[in-house]
UniProtKB/Swiss-Prot annotation:
Keywords: Chylomicron, Glycoprotein, HDL, LDL, Lipid degradation, Lipid metabolism, Lipid transport, Secreted, Sialic acid, Signal, Transport, VLDL. The keyword Ribonucleoprotein does not apply. Proapolipoprotein C-II is synthesized as a sialic acid containing glycoprotein which is subsequently desialylated prior to its proteolytic processing. InterPro entries: Apo-CII, ApoC-II_dom_sf. Pfam families: Apo-CII. Residues 78-101 are annotated as: Lipoprotein lipase cofactor. Its main location: secreted. This is Apolipoprotein C-II. GO terms for molecular function: lipase inhibitor activity; lipid binding; lipoprotein lipase activator activity; phospholipase activator activity; phospholipase binding. Residues 1-22 form the signal peptide. One of its GO terms (biological process) is high-density lipoprotein particle clearance. It is found in: Secreted. Component of chylomicrons, very low-density lipoproteins (VLDL), low-density lipoproteins (LDL), and high-density lipoproteins (HDL) in plasma. Plays an important role in lipoprotein metabolism as an activator of lipoprotein lipase. Both proapolipoprotein C-II and apolipoprotein C-II can activate lipoprotein lipase. It comes from Macaca fascicularis (Crab-eating macaque).
Length: 101
């Protein structure tokens, strides 16, 4: 569960990073220093890698199969309840928007 979440989070951040990199900004009078940007990017990357490694170590150290099973069960029950309530809410909104006929 944790590894998949971290992988998904990394992929989302990677896509967002490419979107930010790919955005074309209009020319400015004074372009930003590429050295500063690369240092900031390297610094953020190293912080991210160390935080990811620390989170992975903490997860592996505190992993309990019983707790993991309870969390999976809680997640499945809560998502089932939320989908039910979302359906009810959607039905109510549609009936209000549609009006009485």
């Amino acid at each position: 569960m944790g590894t998949r979440f971290l992988l998904a989070l990394c992929l989302v951040l990677l896509v967002l990073g490419f979107e930010v990199q790919g955005a074309q900004l209009p020319q400015q009078d004074e372009p930003p220093s590429p050295a500063l940007l690369s240092r900031v990017q390297e610094s953020l990357s190293s912080y991210w890698e160390s935080a990811k490694a620390a989170a992975q170590k903490l997860y592996e150290k505190t992993y309990l199969p019983a707790v993991d099973e309870k969390l999976r069960d809680l997640y499945s029950k809560s998502t089932a309840a939320m989908s039910t309530y979302t359906g009810i809410f959607t039905d109510q909104v549609l009936s209000v928007l549609k009006g009485e006929e």
